[in-house]
Amino acid sequence: MESKESQSLHVEYYGEGEKTIVFIPGLGGTTRYWSHGIGPLAERHRVVLVDLLGFGASPKPWTRYSVERHVAELDAALASLGAITLVGHSLGALLAIAYAARHRNQVENLVLIGMPYFGSEEAAYRYLRSGKVKWGFLYTNVLLVMIACILTRRVFGWLLPYVRRDIPREVAEDLVKHTWRSSTSSLWEVVYRYDAANELRRLSEQTQILMIHGQDDDIAPFAAIKQLADEQPGSTLIELDGLDHHPFLRTPHTCLTHIDSLVSGDRP
């Protein structure tokens, strides 16, 4: 039996504003994915950064990293914060939806950045095996993903800052802060098998939804997000021309401006 009492997600707090904004990173991400860019936001609001279970400085138990388990751990960390705006990137965006659907009275706003949505596990496999994503087929084989995780963490991890020059050094360094179990289980349970569209429909009409997505995102296809946004009442889609899967890393000022406007009630 797992001791839930022994689990405690790593959480960082910045600023002391009236509004609280919680940032959830994607697969392999940590608080350092956000920390370089949230300074201006923390001058006006209380900003909370969290490492998901199995990643970063949070515990990494041998468990099934299901949507329900992730949400339960987030609830233990966030329940005392009162009303919040949830900002999630990639897998973190999917978990933000899941959390909001189960805590509709707490989550006032949702910001979904680079969120992957395929509709089903089979559709995800078809897309990743289509050749549109470099080495995409690898992410559809749990054994290959497991081997890649082990080799990266134990052998080649020190090379990541030199290989992944498209992202900040600290973000690349933290890509090894997980286990093969937390990585593979989260990928399959959350990205491939979770029905985000159905959960979006469960949200309160008062929940404001902001989607920020790069039009050149090959990991999370833009067309699927465009369709979701069109079907979801009260949602706004910010289309970023020429950007990939990491809008917050490429243009943090743009992302922060939209987030601040949403939280402050300044959206047109």
What are these regions, as identified by a protein language model?
Residues G88-G92, A96:
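Gly/Ala-rich beta-loop-alpha elbow adjacent to hydrolase catalytic centers
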Residues L203, M211-H213, D217:
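Short beta-strand/loop motif that positions the catalytic acidic residue
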